[in-house]
Amino acid sequence: MATVQLSTQFSCQTRVSISPNSKSISKPPFLVPVTSIIHRPMISTGGIAVSPRRVFKVRATDTGEIGSALLAAEEAIEDVEETERLKRSLVDSLYGTDRGLSASSETRAEIGDLITQLESKNPTPAPTEALFLLNGKWILAYTSFVNLFPLLSRGIVPLIKVDEISQTIDSDNFTVQNSVRFAGPLGTNSISTNAKFEIRSPKRVQIKFEQGVIGTPQLTDSIEIPEYVEVLGQKIDLNPIRGLLTSVQDTASSVARTISSQPPLKFSLPADNAQSWLLTTYLDKDIRISRGDGGSVFVLIKEGSPLLNP
């Protein structure tokens, strides 16, 4: 008896169904993952099991929403990059101005324009509601406050210069400390004011100064003695008198340690100058721009920020 081998081939087709009511778009539809696969039972035909074709249902979606989201993300990235560029340009323009004292009128105009552009991109519209950003020590980099210029001027006290002006905010205790540090050949000293602040609006705080503090001088307690000094081209050997110089150095170190260990001098501030207000117009983790009485502007950089080391 002859044996006949029956070979049957079935084609498998995929049908894509799109609702006729779908909105007509100019771009081809974006296909999302298969939502369902319909399985039909096996059908027996003449003893041969036949599996019907599978029907895949694929949902089409408009690309408009996805495109809008991508566009918004690109614009946000560009905005951040522009803000960082403005910050760097501002810091670069402050170089050599001695906190504003030595700035020319052209440089002041350039700085003012950069400040205005940054203020328009303020990422923290309500600074007093973001106290964690305000908290910490801020170093003054620039000001237009003319009453501060006499302090910055060199030559008032010979060999003494303003080394640093800072403002430290403690948002937990609502306190502010303004400090000026002076540096000279023999050491450093500081004068500071302690104040309390109250929040008056999302951008404005009222400051009430309570106390002034004159810090204890931090004198240099060590002097490096060279092996020789050169006077008018002639080298003078100091080894024969090194013992005498060492004795003088020890005495100076003892005096310096005694003075530096004394407590600071505190004093009360006059009531008529004990209040002020401060408006923060730009704030992020690196830079703070504030405006005070009379429209004066202050640019401060957070301690530890890489912007302090251009």
Swiss-Prot record:
- Lineage, top-rank taxon, reads Eukaryota
Q: Where does this polypeptide localize?
A: Plastid, Chloroplast, Plastoglobule
According to its UniProt entry, the function of this protein is described as: Probably involved in light/cold stress-related jasmonate (JA) biosynthesis.
Q: Does the keyword S-adenosyl-L-methionine apply?
A: no
Chief subcellular location: plastid
Q: Which residues carry this modification: Phosphothreonine?
A: 61
**Could you tell me what this protein is called?**
Probable plastid-lipid-associated protein 2, chloroplastic
* Protein family membership: Belongs to the PAP/fibrillin family.
Transit peptide residues are 1-59
| Gene Ontology cellular-component terms listed | chloroplast; chloroplast thylakoid; chloroplast thylakoid membrane; cytosol; mitochondrion; plastid; plastoglobule; thylakoid
* Coiled coil regions, renumbered to chain: 65-94
UniProt keywords, alphabetically: Chloroplast, Coiled coil, Phosphoprotein, Plastid, Transit peptide
Further remark? Simultaneous down-regulation of PAP1, PAP2 and PAP3 leads to impaired long-term acclimation to environmental constraint, namely photooxidative stress imposed by high light combined with cold.
